[in-house]
Amino acid sequence: GNTYRDGFKQVDIRPHIMGLFIWTGFDYRGEPTPFEWPSIGTQFGIMDTCGFKKDAFYLNKAFFTDEPMIHILPHWNFAYGEEVHVMTHTNCSEAELFLNGKSLGKKNIDKYDMADWFVPFEKGTLKMVGYIDGKEVCSDEVSTANSAKKIVITPQNEFVYDSCDDAVIFNISVIDENGVSVPTADNLIKFTADGGEIIGVGNGNPNSHEADKAEERHLFNGLCQVIVRQSDGAENVTVTATSDELESATATVKSVANENKKIFITFSNKHFLCR
């Protein structure tokens, strides 16, 4: 069958077609086609079941946004000398790849196929620079990570509403001693919550059979997630994440008044009124 790039091109070159429907925005449980057990969910979403962005997210962004952008993939943690297929998702007219400050060449960008390189792995930083009309307009980079040393918690919400069963999403990652995210980490992360109840955990792994209602989760691609529902009367919701041989982390989200006593659901830094 056609690739997504082919499909987008066939729509884009036909001005009488008003748009297209992307299936799917998110991965979901079931329908692991064409994969079989142990897969228990789809793998063709542009975001996984936790809402973590896949590389396909940036391909879509390159197709649909006018703002200059460039995304480099994959990560930069491989065996020394291994040939790595380096690709870019960009809406720029040219892209230049650098390894540890040395240019590996500038390429013209085809709108649909974009550009790629084959690079022998060498520890350090891989940087991609995007150009439009010969001017640098954006860049992206990935660096080699050492062993994970510290947990990082990033609340997806700035606040939580009191007295309305509001919930907070906490995203978990790990970094090395230099502060570089470790994309290959799969540590088991354990959670405790103060001022709320843990109602779900996840990591976006379509092959994971771990319980979603639990107080721990392995990292997948260096990430996992915990969702906490605020307890009645709690002033804050605090989550602590721990793991063997890693420095623990704690994050707190403050409660704000919900004067109308409405019920909200929370998604991606937004609070949507339910009733």
Regions found by a protein language model. Name each.
Residues 77-82, 160-168:
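Short, solvent-exposed loop/linker segments at the N-terminal edge
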Residues 86-90, 129, 154, 165-183, ...:
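Beta-strand-rich structural segments
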Residues 91-93, 98-104, 140-141, 167, ...:
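Short flexible loop/turn segments that cap and initiate beta-strands
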Residues 263-264, 270-274:
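N-terminal amphipathic/hydrophobic targeting modules at extreme N-termini
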